[in-house]
């Protein structure tokens, strides 16, 4: 592994911090799909115990960011069209439900908080800070989850947050200049008080960039079928 990808952790090895550092390196593209990770090498580079790294690897496997083959090295997972469709369709359905519920609960204070997050997105666009945009995108949606006031839905979406961050990284070819306006449209839909409009806007907010990402993937065979399947699965 090349030097400097994962900064040392001090003074004590903390499995949660190891997990966070590695997941951020994967999502940020510092660790590439298919790249081999070795427990000993990672432990030495990060300055932590092998036990901490093994624990982090197991959690990352459960979250779908790493894959381990029997008697072989652990690899950063390579994502294909099916993976993207599954993430997008599930997230679109859940985000649609969250928007539908949030529409009925939205207060003036909630609206102002969401608008403030969009303003931060606009500042991130001016700085050309895509990493900040991904975090702000997720923050915006987490605000909606909270407003929806559906504990199990929020827990389910929160459990997908690493896959959601990775999804956002995969679709980063989508015009980031449009990020604030896309979120403004979703906020306007919530403010409309029309649950159907809010739900469909939230679904399209996920599906449309996913379709662009599908188009950019190699092997165009079955692309139309994949796009149709995505819309069908998402109820779009």
Question: What are the roles of these predicted feature ranges?
Answer:
Residues 45, 174-236:
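C-terminal regulatory/effector modules of DNA-binding transcriptional regulators
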Residues 87, 108-169, 181-188, 197-207:
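Conserved amphipathic alpha-helical segments that form helical-bundle/coiled-coil interaction surfaces
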Residues 26, 102, 125, 190-193:
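Hydrophobic residues in alpha-helical segments
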């Amino acid at each position: 592994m090349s030097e400097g990808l994962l900064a040392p952790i001090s003074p004590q090895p903390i499995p949660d911090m190891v997990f966070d550092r590695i997941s951020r390196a994967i999502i940020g593209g510092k660790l590439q799909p298919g790249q081999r990770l070795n427990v000993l090498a990672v432990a030495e580079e990060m300055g932590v115990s092998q036990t901490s790294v093994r624990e982090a690897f197991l959690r990352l496997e459960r979250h779908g960011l790493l894959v381990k083959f029997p008697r072989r090295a652990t690899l950063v997972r390579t994502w294909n069209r099916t993976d993207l469709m599954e993430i997008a369709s599930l997230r679109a359905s859940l985000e649609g439900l969250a928007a539908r519920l949030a529409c009925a609960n939205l207060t003036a204070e909630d609206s102002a908080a969401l608008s403030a997050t969009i303003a931060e997105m606009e500042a991130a666009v001016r700085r050309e800070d895509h990493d900040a945009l991904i975090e702000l995108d997720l923050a915006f949606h987490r605000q909606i989850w909270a407003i929806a006031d559906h504990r199990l839905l929020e827990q389910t979406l929160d459990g997908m947050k690493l896959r959601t961050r990775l999804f956002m990284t995969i679709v980063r070819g989508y015009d980031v200049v449009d990020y604030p306006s896309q979120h403004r449209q979703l906020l306007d839909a919530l403010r409309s008080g029309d649950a159907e409009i809010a739900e469909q806007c939230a679904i399209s907010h996920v599906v449309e960039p996913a379709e662009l990402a599908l188009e950019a993937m190699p092997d165009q065979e079955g692309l139309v079928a994949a796009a149709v399947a995505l819309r069908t699965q998402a109820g779009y």
